[in-house]
Structures are given as C-alpha cells and as structure tokens.
Amino acid sequence: MRTRVSGWLLAAALVVHLLALYLPGSPDPGPDVVPHLDKLVHVLLFATPALLICRITSKWWPIVAMAAHAPVSELVQYRLVPHRSGDVWDLVADAVGVILGLGLASLAARRDAGASPKLGLPYGEGLEQPR
C-alpha cells in the first residue's frame, strides 16, 4: 500500500518538477522578494522525487537519471524556454537536492528498520525506544 501511495506522490512530484522547470518565465519577473528563494525551490524540486524514488525502488538508474536531468534542464532553460536562463548555481542546487533526497531516504529506511536515527543502532542495544 505504501508503495502505491509513494508512486502517486512521485507522479505528482514529477509533474510539478517538470512544470516548474520548463514553463516559460515572466518577461518582467520583478524584484526578488526573498533573495535566492529559487535555489531552495531547485533543491526541493530535485529532493522530493529522489526521496520518493528511493522509497519505491532500490534500483540505481532512476537516481542517475535525476542527476543527469539537472544539467539537461539548465541547458534547455538557457536555450529553449522563453524568459528562462540556465544557471550554474541552479545546477548546484539541483545536485544538492538529489543528494538531500538520497540522505532523507536513507534516514527513513533506517527508521523503518528500527534503527536509531542518531546512531544507526537497533533499539535495545543500550538505547531506549522513544515513547
């Protein structure tokens, strides 16, 4: 059941991911209300699918595809999407997002296996289970 829900969440996350990356930008975007907020958005756009992919499958190729999609998306934005620009720092934020998604998936897997998130030890080896 959890895999089915994760699959639907992944599909939704990928739709948001693709729309956010490839919709044309505004010809006059105006001033940044929050400086560098776009970098946080890039991190989240790549971390969310990476996390969900890891929750669904142990295959490595979808994560490689996510990582490869980062520079491709920046090139497409730079060359093909009106009023968008490719940016090296966006690419860095995309890579950070993939790594963050992998890390969060690893923490979730440890938690699901009954390990302590702090030490990676199973409960009962000198640690009390939280109440």
What are these regions (language model features)?
Residues 32, 61, 116-120:
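Membrane-interface helix-loop junctions in multi-pass transporters/channels
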Residues 1-54, 66:
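"…centered on the first transmembrane helix and the immediately adjacent amphipathic helix/loop
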Residues 44-60, 98-108:
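Membrane-interfacial alpha-helical segments at the cytosolic side of multi-pass membrane proteins
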